[in-house]
Regions:
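Residues on the lipid-exposed face of transmembrane beta-strands in outer-membrane beta-barrel proteins
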Residues: 1-2, 56-60, 107-113, 154-160, ...
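Flexible loop and strand-edge segments within Gram-negative outer membrane beta-barrel domains
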Residues: 5-67, 73-102
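Structural signature of Gram-negative outer-membrane beta-barrels, strongest in the C-terminal barrel
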Residues: 5-7, 13, 117, 145-269, ...
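Transmembrane beta-strands of outer-membrane beta-barrel pores
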Residues: 16-20, 62-64, 73-77, 115-117, ...
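Outer membrane beta-barrel strand-and-loop segments of large Gram-negative receptors
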Residues: 104-110, 145-147, 151-155, 234, ...
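C-terminal beta-signal and adjacent terminal beta-strands/loops
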Residues: 269, 372-381, 402-449
């Protein structure tokens, strides 16, 4: 950080992260996978993820105006090594040919004006995303290609203090996508302090999500289904649009106790999917898959959360979410049957977690957490079965510690899924589709300067 004057600040940041995720048969994943009646040994897989980023930002604080501008860029590269044991019982791993590389650049600018009974914000954003990856050009050959897309937005938002207890916020955002054109997205929110400890808040917002670069590039073919098929992007895709309403109530006191309940409802359309169009690709001779928009859907539910200070050193936090999701149109089918009324894929009806924290000293905190994910149903067109597949719920436990070893250095260590709990074996007939991660160890060092 650089502060040339009391009212101005320049911020510069650079970071680089490298992560290796290893899945070993018989340890962090099942040794075998059942595909129908066929038992197949799993391969060992190492995923190397490299992420670098930089930030340059400036802000100023005047008596009325607070301007800000920031430029962000991140580059993510993924490399995968996989293989099976050789005749000497040693793992023979080789890098796969694909090496996806994504570069995201974002420029944000806004100015906030603190006016009598109003806080007005006006701003804009520019995004540029570029993807370099393999694209199939022949049955056994690939070629590295590069595609990019730009997106711009301007927005205005105003928070109005209607009374000492009521604040109203209204906003309007105009998104302009290089492919999809312009979309208006309004937002309205209200916060009402019923008492000093009890707050009621709620609102409604419209949003849209554009498909990824790969999904909208018709000349970009990616092998799928183990190389048996090829999937092309679709320039005619529409972005997913949604309208969300929520209302919640929050209680907190000066002793650190808090509790909240929130009801939410989201309706969206143009859900993104992919499927086999039933023809052979003229270039590769493989089965052809395509991305498309289908159907309307609804997600609604309730979220409950609380934080309880037991004493000065112990505290408990917990939350629970009930989610009811369903498809509301009959333009999706599985094995000739409409999926209308089926839940959205991989969306658990029940999810909960609880965490216990203990401040052993001022600098060391131990914690333990329980995490529950309920039963999930995968009823999509490409679920690998002829009927909706069911994945049973399961509970896992994590333990860890945070250690402020120096004023500017924080160490985090955790054992995830400490009991090595797993849901169930893969069953492509009508059951589980996901291999669970076993016990993992995680460590992080954060240095501030």
């Amino acid at each position: 950080q650089f502060t040339p004057t009391e009212s101005q600040k320049f911020v510069f940041e650079y970071g680089k992260n490298n992560q290796v995720h290893t899945l070993t048969p018989g340890e962090s994943l099942d040794a075998w996978t059942m595909r129908g009646n066929l038992k197949q040994p799993n391969s060992k897989r190492e995923t190397h993820n490299s992420r670098s980023h930089w930030v340059a930002a400036w802000n100023a604080q005047g008596e009325i105006l607070h301007p800000e501008i920031a430029v962000y860029q991140e580059k993510v590269i993924r490399e995968v090594k996989s293989g099976k044991k050789d005749k000497y019982n040693h793992w023979d791993l080789n890098y796969e040919s694909r090496k996806p590389e994504i570069t995201n650049t974002i420029i944000d600018a806004k100015v906030t004006a603190f006016l009598p009974e109003n806080v007005l914000t006006i701003g804009g954003q520019f995004q540029h995303a570029e993807l370099r990856d393999d694209s199939a050009t022949g049955k056994k050959t690939t070629e590295t290609q590069s595609v990019s897309v730009k997106q711009k937005a301007v927005f205005i938002e105003n928070e109005y203090a209607a009374t000492d207890s009521l604040a109203l916020t209204g906003g309007l955002r105009l998104d302009n996508h290089e492919i999809y054109g312009s979309y208006w997205n309004p937002r309205l929110y209200a916060v009402y302090n019923l008492t000093d400890n009890l707050t009621l808040k709620g609102g409604i917002a419209k949003a849209f999500r554009a498909p990824s670069i790969r999904e909208v590039s018709p000349g970009f073919g990616t092998l799928t289904q183990g190389g048996a098929s090829i999937m092309y992007g679709n320039r005619d895709l529409k972005p997913e649009t949604s309208v969300t309403e929520e209302i919640g109530i929050i209680y907190n006191n000066d002793r650190g106790f808090s509790a909240s309940a929130t009801l939410f409802n989201t309706d969206f359309k143009n859900k993104l999917t992919s499927y086999d169009i039933g023809t052979k690709d003229p270039v590769t001779g493989l089965n052809t898959f395509i991305y498309d928009n289908v159907g309307e859907a609804n997600i609604r539910g309730v979220e409950l959360a609380t934080q309880i200070p037991v004493n000065d050193k112990w505290r408990v936090s917990a939350n629970y979410t009930f989610t009811d999701s369903r498809r509301e149109s009959d333009d999706e089918s599985l094995n000739g049957k409409s999926l209308k009324g089926e839940p959205l894929e991989r969306t658990p009806r029940h999810a909960a977690n609880a965490k216990l924290e203990w401040d052993y000293t001022q600098d060391i905190t131990f914690y333990s957490s329980l995490n529950y994910t309920g039963k999930q149903i995968w009823a999509a067109q490409r679920n690998g079965a002829k009927v909706p597949r069911v994945r049973n719920g399961f509970t896992s436990m994590d333990i860890g510690l945070n250690y402020q070893i120096l004023p500017d250095m924080l160490i985090n260590f955790a054992v995830l899924n400490v009991t090595d709990r797993k849901s169930e074996d893969i069953d492509t007939i009508d059951g589980n589709w996901q291999v669970d991660e076993g016990r993992r160890y995680w460590a992080n060092v954060r240095v501030s300067f």
